[in-house]
Every structure is written in structure tokens, then in C-alpha cells.
């Protein structure tokens, strides 16, 4: 965890507002996800790694960021997806890379966050 905290100043700037927690364990989690947004690790795996229960993680994350861990993680993934789409990747490839089970679920989540579909972004 201390190694991850040392890496914070080296992180690239995030081009969107993103609430960050203060708890060192949650900072380590968020840092790892910022570096690898499409990480397949589940919340249970993160909790085991961080030595906390799922309920504790959920409660702390909500209190310190104002949103749920799942919502925060989805925002990271969708912003990463947007960058991939802007680089010319196909909607299908990006949806699968971001861990969505279906392209339609990805499109719905993308539209909810950005107000337009991935296809509209490409135009």
C-alpha cells in the first residue's frame, strides 16, 4: 500500500472530476483502478487484498467520495472507454475490453454518463 501511495504524484491527470477517498486503503484501490481501469478484480477480491469487509469498503467509499464504489469504478471505465473510442477503437471491442457482457449494456451506460451514444461520439 505504501508503494502505491508513493506513486500518487506520478499519476497522469484525470480529465474529469473524480472524488478521491482519504483512507489509505481506498486510495491504494483507486490508484490501482486509475492505472488499470479494466481490471477484472471483483470487490470481494479487493476487500481480501485490503483486509476489510465488503460492507466496510462500501460504507467508507460512500462516506468519503459521495458515491458507491461500483458507480465510481463504472465512471473510470467509461472515461477510459471514451478515450479508446476517440482513438478509433470499435464500440464492440471497447465494450468487451471494459468488461461489459453485452454491447447494448455498454451503450446504455455510456449514454447515461455522457448524454450520447458511443456511435454519436465517433461522428
Describe each model-derived feature in a short phrase.
Residues 1-19, 49:
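Linker/hinge segments immediately adjacent to helix-turn-helix/homeobox DNA-binding domains
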Residues 7-14, 29-42, 61, 65, ...:
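Basic, amphipathic alpha-helical hairpins
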Residues 13-25, 59, 66-74:
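Short, Lys/Arg-enriched anionic-surface-contact patches
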Residues 24-32, 73, 77-80:
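Pre-recognition alpha-helix immediately N-terminal to the DNA-recognition helix
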Residues 40, 44, 63-103, 107, ...:
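Terminal helix-turn-helix DNA-binding modules in bacterial transcription factors
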Residues 48, 59, 63, 96-97, ...:
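Alpha-helical residues within the helix-turn-helix
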Residues 49-56, 99-105:
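Short, basic interhelical loop/turn and adjoining N-cap
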Residues 109, 113-123:
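Short, basic/aromatic-enriched C-terminal tail that caps enzymatic domains
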Amino acid at each position: 500500500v505504501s508503494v502505491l501511495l508513493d506513486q500518487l504524484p506520478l499519476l497522469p491527470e484525470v480529465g474529469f472530476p473524480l472524488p478521491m477517498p482519504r483512507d489509505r486503503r481506498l486510495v491504494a484501490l483507486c490508484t490501482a483502478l486509475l492505472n488499470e481501469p479494466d481490471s477484472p478484480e471483483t470487490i470481494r477480491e479487493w476487500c481480501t487484498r485490503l483486509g476489510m469487509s465488503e460492507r466496510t469498503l462500501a460504507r467508507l467509499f460512500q462516506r468519503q467520495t459521495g458515491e458507491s464504489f461500483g458507480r465510481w469504478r463504472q465512471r473510470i471505465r467509461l472515461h477510459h472507454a471514451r478515450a479508446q473510442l476517440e482513438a478509433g477503437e470499435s464500440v464492440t471491442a471497447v465494450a468487451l475490453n471494459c468488461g461489459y457482457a453485452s454491447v447494448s449494456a455498454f451503450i446504455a451506460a455510456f449514454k447515461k454518463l455522457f448524454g450520447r451514444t458511443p456511435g454519436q461520439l465517433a461522428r
